[in-house]
């Protein structure tokens, strides 16, 4: 009986090690493909202070396709509703808060395996100033379940911004 238990444990260990090795053998681009839930965006100021532009419990998704396309939506969980219940008749204050607390971007992407970066080639965004830009992010962590990428120099010298994602199962 003990021999069967030991054999089963060894088989399980070998299979999990094999799965880990297979993941390591995949290119970063192959590993990144799929659908990711947005966990949090964390901005770290030069003095080390952290802030969360979409709050600490945001909603969102990031999708990478095998043919090099991406779509990203980040929304704070506490974005206020428009009082009129009509998206075309909100107040300037309502629109300003929505703009501050949400971001949608799509386009194409490339992965630089050697430098461990992903570059987003933005076709369109809810922040139109980004259209046509290529924005590169460091791939800080990429496992079967987690993806973290960081913009090391946020505009205006505000520090760095890291986005944390969990793979959708």
Ranges and model annotations:
Residues 1-10:
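Bacterial N-terminal signal peptides that target proteins for export
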């Amino acid at each position: 009986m003990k021999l069967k238990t030991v054999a089963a444990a060894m088989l399980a260990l070998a299979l999990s090690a094999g799965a880990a090795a297979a993941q390591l053998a995949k290119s970063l681009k192959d590993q990144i493909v799929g659908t990711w839930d947005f966990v949090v965006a964390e901005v770290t100021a030069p003095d080390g202070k952290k802030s969360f532009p979409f709050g600490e419990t945001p909603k969102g998704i990031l999708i990478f396709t095998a043919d090099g396309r991406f779509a990203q939506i980040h929304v704070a969980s506490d974005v206020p509703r428009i009082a009129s219940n009509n998206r075309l008749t909100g107040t300037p204050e309502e629109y300003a808060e929505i703009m501050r607390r949400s971001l949608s971007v799509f386009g194409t992407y490339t992965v630089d395996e050697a430098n461990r970066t992903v570059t987003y080639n933005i076709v369109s965004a809810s922040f139109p100033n980004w259209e046509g830009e290529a924005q590169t992010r460091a791939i800080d962590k990429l496992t079967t379940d987690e993806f973290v990428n960081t913009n090391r120099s946020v505009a205006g010298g505000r520090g760095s911004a890291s986005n944390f994602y969990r793979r959708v199962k």
